[in-house]
Amino acid sequence: MVLRTMLVKPHCLEKMIRVIRNLCPDIMVLTEVEGKHNSPSFVNRFIEVLFYYSAYFDSLDAFMEAADPNRLAMEGTLMASAVRNMIAREGGERIMRHVGLDTWRLFLNRVGFEEVEVSEDALYQAKLIVKSYNHAESVSLEMNGKSLTIGWKGTPLHSVSAWRCF
């Protein structure tokens, strides 16, 4: 599920998370964009989106050829629509809204989930995988509290967090 698309309808998001909460899964893993692209201020949102996607495109340059069909599809479909959504749309028309891990922490704690620490083993395995690629020095894998933040050249791009019912 993509929670960032539900932020525009907070009552639906809360209802869905409460349904998951009532199922009381042993663990729920949340992987989300680590961006603050939900500002009502166009200028603030534009700057955040610019820095985030500059880092994202830079990482694609490092790992994929410019003519790679997968890269072209990702840039032309996924990323273009996300940027267009966050920059060119306002209010209810702006469907995709990225918020940072701290916002998800507050929300999930409020609806009955507690954060579970990503294990040292998982972090170690992630670092081993990253080291197997060129440009590994540009990838950051850092703990943010109990969660993992994945970044490129100092810019956080994604977070991975684990949650359980309390």
Task: Identify what each model region corresponds to.
Residues M1-F166:
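Domain-level detector for long C-terminal conserved domains
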